């Protein structure tokens, strides 16, 4: 692996069952081609997008009394305003499998800093990337440059936003209702409010 990829700027980490390679988006096409052609990673098993916004932060940071359900004594996480750039926020993980060598490999690449965030499409290398990339586009808003048919695949065409982003409101932007006067289904702003959905667990610092 190191011999084939020695000319690229990569970071390699290993555990008992998997190898992970972190690369720059500019090298994605060349590295992916080398992995398939020279190292027999014939199959792309999955494409996973991750949003690192507020990574490591938690809502439950309080020693106050608890008495009002899940919303008790909680200070909600503050989501920053969306900037024009996304430095270090979105990453894409490609899960590869070499059947002939019985080896798994994870390829990790952070997206461009542009808005929308983007990486090159790997459809021309592994055809299975087609719907995986469409899913990541639909749910995370990541653009895959060169994809032949990049459109939503899980949400409907009237959907606003990308629901797996951490700054997407948990109650959504729109709801679908039946309008009795128009006698048709219509979109309208959501009519519910949000609150923390995870109970607080109190632990003794000495445990």
Say what each PLM segment does:
Residues 1-207:
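Terminal low-complexity/charged segments
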């Amino acid at each position: 692996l190191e011999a084939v990829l020695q000319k690229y700027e990569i970071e390699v980490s290993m555990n008992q069952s998997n190898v992970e390679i972190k690369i720059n988006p500019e090298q994605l096409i060349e590295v992916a081609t080398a992995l398939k052609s020279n190292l027999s990673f014939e199959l792309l098993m999955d494409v996973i997008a991750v949003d690192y916004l507020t990574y490591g932060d938690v809502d439950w940071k309080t020693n106050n009394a608890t008495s009002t359900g899940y919303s008790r004594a909680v200070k909600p996480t503050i989501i920053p305003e969306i900037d024009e750039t996304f430095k270090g926020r979105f990453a894409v993980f490609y899960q590869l499998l070499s059947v002939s060598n019985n080896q798994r490999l994870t390829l990790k690449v952070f997206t461009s800093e542009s808005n929308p965030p983007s990486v090159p499409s790997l459809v021309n290398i592994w055809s299975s990337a087609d719907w995986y990339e469409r899913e990541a586009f639909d749910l995370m808003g990541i653009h895959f440059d060169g994809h032949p048919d990049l459109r939503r695949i899980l949400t409907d065409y009237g959907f606003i936003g990308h629901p797996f982003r951490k700054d997407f409101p948990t109650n959504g932007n729109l709801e679908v209702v039946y309008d009795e006067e128009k006698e048709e289904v219509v979109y309208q702003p959501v009519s519910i409010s949000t609150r923390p959905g995870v109970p607080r667990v109190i632990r003794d610092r000495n445990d």
